[in-house]
Regions:
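Soluble catalytic regions of large protease machineries
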Residues: 2-213
Length: 213
């Protein structure tokens, strides 16, 4: 990391430690709430908060999948625009597991509230309806390797991402508390910071609402 990125990492880590007992919606930076409300993407602040959280988990899923498969990217952000609610910028190929990166946003959203589909028939039915999603669905299907159907590829992606739920959550919360984009070096450091702390109960059980600001 550059010195500037180290300062970003330290500031984000300090904020996450300070807010460790608060739930995800309570840690959303006002910038992301106002950006969604002022831009007309949410009718009130409450749905703006919720939308920011869902987007943060989605983009954090892409980040973790990229890091897990050895792909590179330039930065990640939950800035809402006319074409997307957030973005991981300039992702390079993830090799033969590139499809994992494209599935990761949806998988992370389901890991957030533990709504993954265990039944293969139910998953196949859902996949048949999955379209667009900022290009994720199209890229997922385009990068399936030999020997993979959609369901088997999805299960493979889940096997990679489910053990990394803590990392996804940590990066999602980092995206929520920091009001600007996160460069690759900072996201990688945040990912590595929890890679050896999977047994930390405080990281997995934040349910308190923060005081109104």
């Amino acid at each position: 990391m550059t010195p500037a990125q180290q300062r970003q990492f330290d500031a984000i880590t300090a904020d996450l430690n300070r807010l460790v007992r608060y739930d995800d919606e309570s840690v959303v930076h006002e910038h992301w709430i106002r950006q969604r409300y002022d831009g007309g993407y949410a009718a009130t602040y409450r749905p703006a908060r919720t939308a920011a959280v869902i987007t943060a988990w989605h983009e954090a899923g892409h980040v973790v999948a990229a890091l897990a498969t050895g792909a590179r990217f330039t930065s990640a952000s939950i800035r809402h625009s006319a074409t997307s609610a957030g973005r991981v910028h300039a992702i390079t190929t993830g090799g033969r597991d590139a499809f994992v990166i494209h599935a990761a946003g949806q998988i992370a959203e389901r890991l957030r509230d533990w709504t993954t589909l265990d039944d293969d028939a139910e998953l196949a039915a859902w996949l048949s309806t999955w379209r667009d999603d900022g290009g994720d669905a199209r890229h997922f299907r385009a990068t399936l390797g030999p020997g993979y159907g959609e369901v088997s590829a999805w299960r493979h992606a889940e096997r990679i991402l489910t053990p990394r739920r803590l990392q996804i959550r940590h990066l999602a919360r980092a995206l929520l508390v920091y009001p600007r984009y996160l460069p690759y070096g900072v996201t990688k450091a945040l990912y590595q910071a929890v890679s050896y702390q999977a047994g930390n109960p405080a990281s997995e059980s934040s349910t308190t609402s923060a005081p109104a600001s």
